[in-house]
Amino acid sequence: MLMDSLQEIICEKRTYTRLYHSHKHAYSQFLFPLEGSIDLETEGRQVKLNPDHFLYIPPQCEHRFRSIGRNECLVLDVPLHAMKIDEYRAGSGIEAALDPFWSSIRYLLTEEAKAGTANSLHMLVQYIKEKLQSHSYASIAYIHSHLFERLTIKKLAEIEHYHPAYYSSWFKKQTGKSPQNYIADLRLEEAKRMLMERNETLTVVSEALGFQNLSSFTRWFTKSTGMPPRLYRNTLYSDKK
């Protein structure tokens, strides 16, 4: 079911029933639970949305939702002409924790909903748009901070609340690479940086990069670059002379 297009920004409190409803709409929607939780499904993703998180649902994104028990949710509906987020960034929605920025936004939106006016909504929507454009995804941040640990699609998909089968295609939309290639490229760049900047032995470098021994590091690096790490380092030093 496609909801009609929207002309004006709407900010109001809503409640949901225990029965699942499904639809999509031609405008953006933000959900800020105030009480209780919302069970929500989009393509490849299942979320139990609580008051410490919010969810952005992009236009044309089919979603199912319900809430069991007492609930109240602050909802912001934004017409397409007022805010358009690039599809590759939005995917099937953005869920994030309420950090100080989003907590402030929720408070200001709540005040607008109480007043029943739209005086500041356009300005708040612009703040929200700028924030979303610079949004960083939790699983990508996790990769960077756990680069040389064992990383699985299952684990990364869980962080984003996606099904593993959907996660890889979603990830490629965000980065232009598969998760495996993205991780491999990051690891290789870090290995090159360490070989260039550090004076430690190759054994120490390989251990820092998470390899069990020097031979496995050498095989991996040679396969990735076409030359062994010792030759790569010597080439760097000779180029600097």
Swiss-Prot record:
Give start-end ranges for the coiled-coil region(s). none
Q: Where is the signal peptide?
A: none
User: What Pfam family is a match for this entry?
Assistant: Cupin_2
Keyword list (alphabetical) reads: DNA-binding, Transcription, Transcription regulation
SUPFAM superfamilies according to UniProt: Homeodomain-like (SSF46689), RmlC-like cupins (SSF51182)
Domain Cupin type-2, by residue range, is 22-78
Q: List, in alphabetical order, the Gene Ontology terms for molecular function in this entry.
A: DNA-binding transcription factor activity; sequence-specific DNA binding
Superkingdom, natural source: Bacteria
Q: Which residues bind DNA?
A: 154-175, 202-225
**Which residue numbers delimit the HTH araC/xylS-type domain?**
137-235
Entries under PANTHER family matching the protein: ARAC-FAMILY TRANSCRIPTIONAL REGULATOR (PTHR43280:SF26)
> What's the name of the protein?
Uncharacterized HTH-type transcriptional regulator YobQ
Species of origin: Bacillus subtilis (strain 168)
Q: Which gene encodes it?
A: yobQ
